[in-house]
Amino acid sequence: GIRDDIDAYIQKTYPTEEQRKAVSQYARSLQASLLVDLENKITVKAATNTTSRAISCIFKKVPSGNSPNGGSVVEEILGVTTNTKQRLLQYIALDKALDGTVISSPSGDVCDESLFTMPDQRL
């Protein structure tokens, strides 16, 4: 799921339901990616593909991919998600686990309009 602090940030920052859904999709995928088994290349790549879809959804639903704060939505959510040393180190380890892999740009419907839920695990 989405951490309470990130959900509150999204609710406060993004003015439309469509934008909140897109940003929430990214926040969920990013949070889930921090919990994958980094030794399992298949799950690492699957988590990254899910995050890539969510980023594409942001650019589809949020004008220019910019937040009302004037920054990049992706950078803002990444910043609030990796706001502790443990979370940042986990994100860096995930990035390192992706070394040498190729990630394709997602195609088709990149936005998950349903309010799907993932296990509520948090770092």
Regions found by a protein language model. Give the residues of each.
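Calcium-binding acidic motifs and repeat modules
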Residues: D4-L123
